[in-house]
């Protein structure tokens, strides 16, 4: 089943929030940051049916919009890796302690588990790559890889924050991400798209 991917650049750190929908009109919201009004407008305009919020990791700029989405679609589950849950609950760990209003989310979550997962009506492959954060996860749907801050065009995620480990991040990307088909479209948490093939050839970290 073909999917459509729409990117919204939102929040204080220009985070990429992704709206992914299939031909049936079901959709997933990846990494909602602050100011998701345009995402909600698109869901309404296209008559989409939200299935889940999926969080690649728990840093504040990737979670600030959870309440905004759930304010309209309270019934949908929130997925995150278990090792990231402490970041949802602790503004020191998620980085929002430096904001005027530190953010926490203490609602129910569902676990992202490495391997094949059915999320709503979507068949996904979850790839766990710690190093930017304790349980950072990339989620592959069709040819698209939603990887948060694990891998960027020409770079990798920083590793100087809570749970960071630069070598573990590099090793994980090399062993789990760069082995994907080279036409895989990498949808990162910031910046533009790239492909696995391009990163193999051009990323100075590999």
Describe each PLM feature range:
Residues 34-117, 205:
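Active-site HxH/HxHxD metal-binding segment of metal-dependent hydrolases
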Residues 2-46, 138-148:
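Conserved beta-strand hairpin/beta-sheet module of binuclear metal-dependent hydrolase folds
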Residues 93-97, 123-206:
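Metallo-beta-lactamase
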Residues 8-9, 107-109, 128-130:
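Short Gly/Pro-enriched turn/cap motifs at secondary-structure boundaries
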């Amino acid at each position: 089943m073909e999917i459509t991917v729409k990117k919204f650049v939102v929040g204080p750190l220009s985070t990429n929030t992704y709206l992914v929908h299939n031909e049936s009109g079901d959709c997933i919201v990846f990494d909602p940051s602050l100011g998701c009004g345009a995402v909600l407008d698109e869901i309404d305009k296209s008559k989409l049916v939200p299935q889940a919020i999926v969080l690649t990791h728990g840093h504040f700029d990737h979670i600030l919009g959870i309440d905004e989405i759930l304010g309209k679609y309270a019934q949908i589950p929130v997925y995150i890796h278990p090792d990231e849950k402490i970041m949802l609950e602790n503004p020191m760990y998620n980085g929002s302690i430096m904001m005027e209003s530190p953010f926490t989310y203490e609602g129910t979550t569902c676990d992202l588990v490495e391997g094949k997962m059915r999320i709503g009506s979507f068949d996904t492959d979850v790839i766990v790559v710690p190093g930017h954060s304790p349980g950072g996860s990339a989620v592959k749907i069709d040819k698209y890889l939603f990887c948060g801050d694990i891998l960027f065009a020409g770079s990798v995620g920083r590793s100087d924050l809570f749970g960071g480990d630069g070598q573990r991040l590099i090793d994980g990307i090399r062993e789990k991400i760069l082995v994907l088909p080279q036409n895989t479209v990498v949808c990162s948490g910031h910046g533009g798209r790239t492909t696995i093939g391009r990163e193999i050839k051009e990323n100075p970290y590999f």
